[in-house]
Amino acid sequence: MSLVARRSLLALSIGTALGAADVRAETPTGGRRLALRGYDPVAYFTLGRPEKGEETFSFAFDDAVYRFKTAEHRAMFAADPERYAPQYAGFCAAGVSKGIKVEPDPEAWAIVGGKLYVVAQKEKIDEFKRDPSGFIGKADTNWPVVRESAPKVPAR
């Protein structure tokens, strides 16, 4: 490769990398993952259903950004994030039980033992509910390793 071609390739690579960094820094999540695809984790507990959160009411926790339907929900989460944050950083509990990190469907959920669990598919939530302790036991064992891995399925 000629010197001119190498310099052009280098300039293009640097420009692309800088452009990507700039876009990431400008995102509303500050480069962090948007947990629960923007659904309000407190709503599962207070309303008994999933509700889309608003960008205006956001809170960063555990390398992710959570959104909330109301300022009150944001304040409740900020005061006690361990109480309201979904288990496994909001990744699919069934996936974690199998040793993989998968983005969830926020509408496929269950509260077990006062903790929020989400799974990747609505069809899987009934299976999870039939044997929550089986899924949770395996997921708890796998989570320390799975936590460090990359998600297998990108967010929708």
Task: Pin down the residues of each PLM region.
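Charged, low-complexity intrinsically disordered segments
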Residues: 21-156
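Hydrophobic h-region of N-terminal signal peptides that target proteins for export
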Residues: 14-22
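N-terminal secretory signal peptides and thylakoid transit peptides that target proteins
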Residues: 1-15
